[in-house]
């Protein structure tokens, strides 16, 4: 196992800055996930750790040894690519052992290692097949197996599940999680899929335009996002936002006026919030309540009803602001499109974002955080 440290690491191509002053300490055996929209620099950071991209400025350390000028082959890292990168003319066994053969390992050692990893990944019965005879999930396991055979101290995975269908993604996600628990190796994983990030990571690094927006445990990011970008990116369906106005403040609460002119106090810190300022209220779809059990309500018109079997998602337009909210309940909700629908807003579940998009610290304690 190895630790990985990035100290003020930046990457630029000419005048174009891709990653800006990244500071991150990854502990031995930790599973870190980089997540963010396309073009945010997450794969670039992974490639710098691997040695496939030069570091423009800053220091990259593995086990407290500076790696900026160390060749990729000597860094002790293994990388799994999005495209699998398997040799089509080689068998599964030959693909998995390719790196060991290049390194001049003994034939007996190669055979033993390939057999061990193949059994771990349930590939033993496929060792004589070529990639074209494998399913997408099997090819991905071969790509992972090839990396495991080399026994790296740090695993780098660059969107390894993006080419798989939905069912296979779930299966492979579980397998990668089990693999990490079994090996206890440091894993750094890149994805644009926040579901993968939430389910796999010990900690998530959210990137926005080359900057680190927030680092934290999955539930910490979900319940206590530091800004509106993180709040909207983490969670599916994403957080609802409403324009509101601050009407009063206290040390540990802020009073806001909703679009329907109702006033409510939110249990958030009032630092940086001024009376009269236009701010944003955020609330997750599953935290909205049926109107009969809520004191604060909003009325809207049903636009779309999505019945998913295990849950219902109701898309509601608030006429006063011509803005849609998503209401999510873990059951069947029978409501017609075009009808009037009233939802409840529990104050302790609400988020408040200042005019600059930063979050007011929530004071309600969420379980598991």
Swiss-Prot record:
GO terms for cellular component: ATP-binding cassette (ABC) transporter complex, substrate-binding subunit-containing; maltose transport complex. The keyword ATP-binding applies. The keyword Cytoplasm does not apply. CDD domains: ABC_MalK_N. It catalyses: D-maltose(out) + ATP + H2O = D-maltose(in) + ADP + phosphate + H(+). Residues 4-234 form the ABC transporter domain. ATP binds at residues 36-43. The complex is composed of two ATP-binding proteins (MalK), two transmembrane proteins (MalG and MalK) and a solute-binding protein (MalE). Belongs to the ABC transporter superfamily. Maltooligosaccharide importer (TC 3.A.1.1.1) family. This is Maltose/maltodextrin import ATP-binding protein MalK. It comes from Photorhabdus laumondii subsp. laumondii (strain DSM 15139 / CIP 105565 / TT01).
């Amino acid at each position: 196992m190895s630790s990985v440290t990035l100290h003020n690491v930046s990457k630029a191509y000419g005048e174009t800055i891709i990653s800006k002053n990244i500071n991150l300490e990854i502990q031995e055996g930790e599973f870190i996930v980089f997540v963010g929209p396309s073009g945010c620099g997450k794969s670039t950071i992974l490639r710098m750790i691997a040695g496939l991209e030069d570091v423009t400025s800053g220091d990259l350390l593995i086990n407290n040894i500076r790696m900026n000028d160390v060749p990729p082959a000597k860094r002790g890292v293994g990388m799994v690519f999005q495209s699998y990168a398997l040799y089509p003319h080689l068998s599964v066994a030959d693909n998995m052992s390719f790196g060991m053969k290049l390194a001049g390992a003994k034939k007996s050692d190669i055979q033993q290692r390939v057999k061990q990893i193949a059994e771990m990944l349930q590939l033993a019965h496929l060792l004589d097949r070529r990639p074209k005879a494998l399913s997408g999930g099997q090819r991905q396991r071969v790509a992972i197996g090839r990396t495991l055979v080399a026994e790296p101290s740090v695993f780098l995975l660059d969107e390894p599940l993006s080419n798989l269908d939905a069912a296979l993604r779930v299966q492979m996600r579980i397998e990668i999680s089990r693999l990490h628990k079994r090996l206890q190796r440091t894993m750094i994983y890149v994805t644009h899929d926040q579901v993968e990030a939430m389910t796999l990571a010990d900690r998530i690094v959210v990137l926005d335009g080359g900057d680190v927006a927030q680092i934290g445990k999955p539930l910490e990011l979900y319940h206590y996002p530091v800004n509106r970008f993180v709040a909207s990116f983490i969670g599916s369906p994403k957080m609802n936002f409403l324009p509101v106005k601050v009407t009063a403040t206290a040390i540990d609460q802020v009073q806001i006026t909703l679009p329907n002119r109702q006033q409510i106090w939110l249990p958030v810190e009032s630092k940086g919030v001024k009376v009269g300022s236009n701010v944003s209220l955020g609330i997750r779809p599953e935290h909205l309540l049926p109107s009969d059990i809520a004191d604060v309500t909003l009325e809207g018109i049903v636009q779309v009803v999505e019945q998913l079997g295990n849950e219902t998602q109701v898309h509601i337009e608030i006429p006063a602001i011509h803005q849609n909210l998503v209401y999510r309940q873990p059951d069947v909700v029978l409501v017609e499109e075009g009808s009037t629908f009233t939802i409840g807003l529990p104050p302790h579940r609400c988020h408040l974002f200042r005019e600059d998009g930063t979050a007011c610290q929530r004071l309600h304690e969420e379980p598991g955080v």
